[in-house]
Amino acid sequence: MAEIFLTIFFISVLLFFLGSGIWVALSMIGVSAIGMMLFTSRPVGDAMATTIWGTSSSWTLTALPLFVWMGEILFRTKLSENLFKGLSPWMQKLPGGLIHVNVVGCALFAAISGSSAATVATVGKMSIPELRKRNYPEKILLGSLAGSGTLGLLIPPSIILIIYGVAVQESIAKLFIAGIIPGIMIAIIFMSYVIIWSLINHKDMPKIIEKYTFLEKIKRSGQLLPVIILILSVIGSIYTGIATATEAASLGVVGALILSYFQKSLNLDTFKSSLLGATKTSCMIAFILAGSTFLSLAMGFTGLPRNLAVWIQNMNLSPYVLIFVLMIFYIILGMFLDGISAVVLTMAIIEPMIRQAGFDMIWFGIFLVIVVEMAQITPPVGFNLFVLQGMANKDMGYIARSAFPLFLLMVLAVIIVVVFPEIALWLPEQMVKNIN
């Protein structure tokens, strides 16, 4: 029963700190310090200093600010406008019309951003006014944008996959490559839903189709070519083993700066604002990660993760039941915490359980990110809902209801990934073979 008491103690103190308005990172450090002072004889100060320094000086973590900066640079370019202009001629004849621009546009921007909120904001900045002008139904317009924006967490480069990789000491390159096929699969599921919805509600869909010759389509899409080359360069360099995730991130930043320069959107103000935005985001994430690592150390000293893993093992839960319980747990947790906090707060306890159950940690990372994606469109703390609320001038309840079908489709995606784990594992296996 000791492990149950310790679990309740840690959770209670953490919730108290969080409820008091203390920063997430400071809350985790505070819980860790109290736990070590009460239940171990280890010196708290030395352990905290060593752990936080070790986490902050991690070479693997270097990829984080670089990928964040790449997204910040491109967020300030004409990419939003180019995405709509380049994709709309190809999408308009599909059932669902230009709604597909939301899905494909989010998938493309996700491949250079790594942030769900930035993906929604960038694509929505152009698509919302354009689709409203063409009288597309608000429900499918906002729902598709909210759901598709979550691809920013899964399709590489993904900030949350970097954090997960650092937390469980798994290869970030493998995690990035593992997210490609599930990300494309979810995008296809969303597009299929848009097609079915539009066929059922065909009376509500606009009938206007702008005519383009094939050469006009190619010309309008040409503006997306530099972005596609940048995406292929970053992901391709990781897959072929030419570059590590950190080196690929450096390549991405240089490419983003060059692209921004030639689009005439790079000046001293945009350079400074992108750098400042990346610094703020990266410092916040690194601080949370440092607190999480110290919490993991403190729990390790108390023996809590090991004892919980043994306790779970003695319950004789089947692996699928454990995964189902964790899915419900993370959905509920995601209703109150952002995705990054949900991951770093729980990995110290969850990781031993997953390893004990025999799951591949690369596969579990993809599973976890998809579930955390679902939380991005669930109230009351669904970040994508807040972003859309500000852009669309609709109440939170309406946007959440519009996004709910996409939430159910993501549940379907989780089931598919659980039943067919090779969807996430095949590409990393091929990558290892190519490198060797």
Residue ranges and their predicted role:
Residues 1-436:
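Alpha-helical transmembrane segments of multi-pass membrane transport proteins
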